[in-house]
């Protein structure tokens, strides 16, 4: 399994522990009740060295909700749940760092918390 695929599986499992989320999806769902999270961990670049393969994976998590106060609390819970990720198949998670977090809203749509992380992983 690719580093991004393994990481996405681990993140989905961790976000499943956030009780107020109605679902965690690999990309935007066609229909879902708020609040929910969509995640993407498919952008990978080389982070290897002489004796081991490695990957840097960019992780984008978007939490959608129609209530901004609850959205901020959910974004905090998402960050907290990613501090102790479960083991990833075939990869060792070396670092998982927050890159950026912002809250956005389309005039005609719901609120979104876009949370971006950078993960560095080594093959085991």
PLM region spans:
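Charged, amphipathic alpha-helical segments and their flanking helix caps
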Residues: 1-23, 41-124
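A short beta-turn/loop motif at secondary-structure boundaries
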Residues: 28-32, 107
């Amino acid at each position: 399994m690719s580093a991004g695929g393994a990481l996405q599986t681990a993140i989905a499992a961790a976000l499943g522990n956030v009780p107020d989320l109605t679902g965690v999806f690999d990309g935007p769902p066609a229909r879902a009740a708020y609040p929910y999270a969509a995640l993407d961990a498919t952008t990978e670049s080389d982070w290897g060295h002489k004796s081991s393969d490695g990957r840097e994976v960019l992780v984008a998590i978007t939490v959608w909700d129609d209530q901004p106060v609850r959205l901020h609390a959910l974004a905090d819970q998402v960050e907290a749940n990613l501090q102790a990720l479960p083991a990833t198949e075939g990869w060792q998670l070396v670092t998982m760092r927050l890159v950026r977090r912002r809250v956005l809203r389309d005039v005609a749509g719901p609120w979104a918390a876009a949370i971006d992380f950078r993960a560095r992983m080594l093959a085991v």
